[in-house]
Amino acid sequence: MLEYNLKPVSYTHLGCNWMALPGREYPLNDCVKINVAHIFDRCFHEVAYKESPSVQKLWDRFLCCLTEAVQVTAEGIAFHLEHMHKVFPELVGNLLMHNTIEQGLDVTQAAEFINIGVDGCGLAIAADSFAALEQRIEREGLLSWNQVTAAIDRNFSGPEHERVQLILKSSERYCQGASLGDKWADRINREFTRRVVRCV
């Protein structure tokens, strides 16, 4: 039989809480997500159908909605931490937490550190969409806002709208390397991160 003389904080335990400082931290990672593609879709429909739409107006509206999404998510996390012990107590033995049994507290109350991760999903879709609109409408003039909205309204059905879809899909995309899509992804990422950090 092996003997282990390690202090509780110097080893890790198995399970889904792989980011945890063993026995000391309450982690909630890979769970909380903000879908930036959905935010883009909402903002596109608010801006593109109005008079004189532009990528800048779309970006301004996107930032406003992104700020709201991050704020609402932060409020939800705070609510979760405040009420988790009442509705879904964490399994004390599984997490090997310190002071939960000794103090009669839930892990969300006894944890020395709280580590919450907020993921931004849908980045490629949002970045590619911004890039396609900027490149094909504003830089090259191959399409108009009216053509794009008409094609979307008809789910790109019919030869004319399929052409619009192909033009948009062949624009500079995310992960092509130094592309317009990459630049938009970086821009969205920076703004997303800035807002999440501000809510901490």
Task: For each feature predicted by the language model, list its residue ranges.
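Conserved catalytic cores of very large enzyme subunits
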Residues: M1-V200
